[in-house]
């Protein structure tokens, strides 16, 4: 999957960016 949450984007290092 490439989605973390609504309005958030997956980071290349792991985790999410909102």
Curated annotation (Swiss-Prot):
Subcellular location: Secreted
Modified residues (Cysteine amide): 18
Molecular-function annotations in GO: toxin activity
Tissue: Expressed by the venom gland.
Disulfides per UniProt: 4-16, 8-18
Cellular component terms per the entry's GO annotation: extracellular region
Keyword set, alphabetical order: Amidation, Disulfide bond, Secreted, Toxin
Entry's family note: Belongs to the poneritoxin-Ae1 family.
Name this polypeptide is given: U1-poneritoxin-Ae1d
Source organism of this protein record: Anochetus emarginatus
